[in-house]
From Swiss-Prot:
Cofactor note: Binds 1 Mg(2+) ion per subunit. Binds 1 Zn(2+) ion per subunit.
Species of origin: Jasminum nudiflorum (Winter jasmine)
Gene name tied to this protein: rpoC1
Entry protein name: DNA-directed RNA polymerase subunit beta'
Keywords: Chloroplast, DNA-directed RNA polymerase, Magnesium, Metal-binding, Nucleotidyltransferase, Plastid, Transcription, Transferase, Zinc
Subunit text: In plastids the minimal PEP RNA polymerase catalytic core is composed of four subunits: alpha, beta, beta', and beta''. When a (nuclear-encoded) sigma factor is associated with the core the holoenzyme is formed, which can initiate transcription.
Length: 691
């Protein structure tokens, strides 16, 4: 069993046949060795119990009930005085039934079988190491052709006759004509190699260090040749160099992890523990089993037939044995990865069996759904919406979610402050949503960060810490600038919220995971808290303004009539000309009263600028007033002069959107300056105190 304190990681890889046998083998007190599954049966047809030597055998995988053997005898688990530890009649060990979740078995295959993951998956590791085309290896594995086994210092039929040099695609049609059945079997076993056994022989002969050295030499030679001018030849060289790089990396990995290449060919097939492929008894003598169990049954059926054929090989035709070996290979392929080669295996209702790969991989696989996507306590989930008024390090948490996540803390606060005498009364107050509950919830949330996570968590910024604040509604409010780190947008995305409980987790959240401390991408160092998607569109709309120039009313009578004389409903457009405002507050107030629009051009009083005063630009228009003052109208600004030609006021041409953006930037700069000055003052005080 995996100890969660000792084992902090999980790795899927190759193991030796000896290791598989060690995992599954048990030695009984009488010296009998058990662990091999030899029967495809699930339940015995008479006793309706697990078949001995079958896929649910209690001798191999452990008792179905803790401390009770197949005979019905009972022993106290863990009692040193109880002896023996095994039942002498049925051979079942007196242990906890949870052993059936991790005790494995094995099937001894009558012929070697290649592991489909390492043969059919791209890139093919077997084809990479052997430096041969995948199509050729597939034909060899599935008995479509064979090659001559080299035998040194011995005359061979193939070499003497000179009929075949290496590959013999027609061996099963031409050679048997010259032999009897017994003679052909002897010839085949001596000089012809086919199937997974042929692959295993070649993998055993490999020297990984020689492969590494030869591949490196060839890679350097191809790099020194340079381009030939022929595009097809150059592309062929590039592909070969890429293949050599992958081959060297694979050889290095095998050397570093002490993995032998021949382990990619199976001689012993591990059998999963029975509780991971359960069986349900639905009626008398009828059971419902998992797809994995049915695929195991098919492997055992075909392997048993092949074993019987090999035991009486004197009278068995060679073609029959070869065909049965191919069926065993296909059955193991379907068990490991159904449908990888050709049509997948189906049941009586034409439903595709779920193989081991289907159980492991994908969104609904064992890793992503059960191990990585587990439901945890003190967590919630909801849709995210934009919260533009929030600070960068804050998030809006709905009251419904917050009261559930922080319920234990609120109960403790109610009991400490004496509004509630016990837990039952405190829960009653929470259900009734009394005002004191929200006050205590606010106090609890002030010093407690939360973690927001958006799946899939592909990098460090996929989960960040925030200071929660209560909001109305049922959606989580999020500052728009943190969306890029989460790869989120506001079109219905959901995010999970978690509450760190321990002091270590809270300290880690505050010191390392707060959003305002993760402003740069950990991968490339670029700023990651930048406006994206909806924010860019909003900034464009806010600052686009009206495209009409300042002379549009004068030279376009149609626009002049529409802009000056036309009135919209509800008196929403009272200003017939571009209005003048003395400050930004008046302009925004007019917008809120719906007297002007967001992109309506207006004149805003601005401090006198020496660059404008010294400018030699000629005005477009000059408007005179009855009291002698006049307005000089330029492209982007307006100057009000007195009768003595003195500059009274300066106005700039802008919109409410530009004003709003400018005010936000100005407030942000002022806040940053105040923060810097306060921190500098604190540093000065500390320095003076030390002096």
């Amino acid at each position: 069993m995996i100890d969660r304190y000792k084992h902090q990681q999980l790795r899927i890889g190759l193991v030796s046949p000896e290791q598989i046998s060690a995992w599954a083998t048990k030695i009984l007190p009488n010296g009998e060795i058990v662990g091999e599954v030899t029967k495809p049966s699930i339940l015995h047809y008479k006793t309706n119990k697990a078949e001995k030597g079958g896929l649910f055998c209690e001798r191999i995988f452990g008792p179905q009930k803790s401390g009770i053997c197949a005979c019905g005898n009972y022993r106290v688990i863990g009692d040193e005085k109880e002896d023996p530890k095994f039942c002498e009649q049925c051979g079942v060990e007196f242990v906890d039934s949870r052993i059936r979740r991790y005790q494995m078995g094995y099937i001894k295959l009558a012929c070697p079988v290649t592991h489909v993951w390492y043969l059919k998956r791209l890139p093919s590791y077997i084809a990479n190491l052997l430096d041969k085309p995948l199509k050729e290896l597939e034909g060899l594995v599935y008995r479509d052709f064979s090659f001559a086994r080299p035998i040194t210092k011995k005359p061979t039929f193939l070499r003497l006759r000179g009929l075949f040099e290496y590959e013999i695609k027609s061996w099963k049609y031409s050679i048997p004509l010259f032999f009897t059945i017994q003679g052909f079997d002897t010839f085949r076993n001596r000089e012809i190699s086919t199937g997974a056994g042929a692959i295993r022989e070649q993998l055993v002969d490999l020297d990984l260090r020689i492969i590494l050295d030869n591949s490196l030499v060839e890679w350097k030679e191809l790099g020194e040749e340079g381009p030939t001018g022929n595009e097809w030849e150059d592309q062929k060289v590039r592909r070969r160099r890429g293949f050599l790089v992958r081959r060297m990396e694979l050889a290095k990995h095998f050397i570093r992890t002490n993995i032998e290449p021949e382990w990619m060919v199976l001689c012993l097939l591990p059998v999963l523990p029975p509780d991971l492929r359960p069986v349900i008894q639905i009626a008398e003598g009828k059971v419902m089993s998992s797809d994995i169990t049915k695929l195991y049954q098919r492997v055992i059926y075909r392997n048993k037939i092949l074993t019987d054929l090999l035991t009486r090989s004197v009278s068995t035709p060679g073609d029959l044995v070869t065909s049965q070996e191919k069926l065993v290979q296909e059955a193991v392929d379907a068990l490991l990865d159904n449908g990888t080669r050709g049509q997948p295996m189906r049941d009586g209702q034409n439903k595709v069996y779920k193989s081991l790969s289907d159980i492991i991989e994908g969104k609904e696989g064992r890793f992503r759904q059960t191990l990585l996507g587990k439901r945890v306590d003190y967590s919630g989930r909801s849709v995210i919406v934009v919260g533009p008024s929030l600070s960068l390090y804050r998030c809006g948490l709905p009251r419904e979610i917050a009261i559930e996540l922080f319920q234990t803390f609120v109960i403790r606060g109610l009991i400490r402050q004496d509004p509630a005498s016990n837990i039952k009364v405190a829960k009653s107050q929470i259900r009734e949503k009394e005002p004191i509950v929200w006050e205590i919830l606010q106090e609890v949330m002030q010093g407690h960060p939360v973690l927001l996570n958006r799946a899939p968590t592909l990098h460090r910024l996929g989960i960040q810490a925030f200071q929660p604040v209560l909001v109305e509604g049922r959606a989580i409010c999020l500052h728009p600038l943190v969306c890029k780190g989460f790869n989120a947008d506001f079109d219905g995305d959901q995010m999970a919220v978690h509450v760190p409980l321990s002091l270590e987790a809270q300290a880690e959240a505050r010191l390392l995971m707060f959003s305002h401390m993760n402003l740069l991408s950990p991968a490339i160092g670029d700023p990651i808290s930048i406006p994206t998607q909806d924010m860019l569109v909003g900034l464009y709309v806010l600052t686009s303004g009206n495209r009409r120039g300042i002379c549009v009313n004068r030279y376009n009578p149609w626009n002049h009539r529409n802009y000056e004389n036309q009135r919209s409903k509800n008196n929403n457009y009272r200003y017939t000309k571009e209005p003048l405002f003395s400050n930004s507050y008046d302009a925004i107030g007019a917008y809120r009263q719906k007297r002007i629009k967001l992109d309506s051009p207006l004149w805003l009083r601005w401090p006198l600028d020496q660059r404008v005063i010294a400018s030699r630009e000629s005005p477009i228009e000059v408007h005179y007033e009855s009291l002698g003052t006049y307005y000089e109208i330029y492209g982007h600004y307006l100057i009000v002069r007195s009768i003595k030609k003195e500059i009274l006021f300066l106005y700039i041409r802008t919109t409410v959107g530009h004003i709003s953006l400018y005010r936000e930037i100005e407030e942000a700069i002022e806040g940053f300056s105040q923060a810097c000055s306060s921190s500098y003052g604190t540093y000065t005080k500390l320095s003076n105190s030390r002096i």
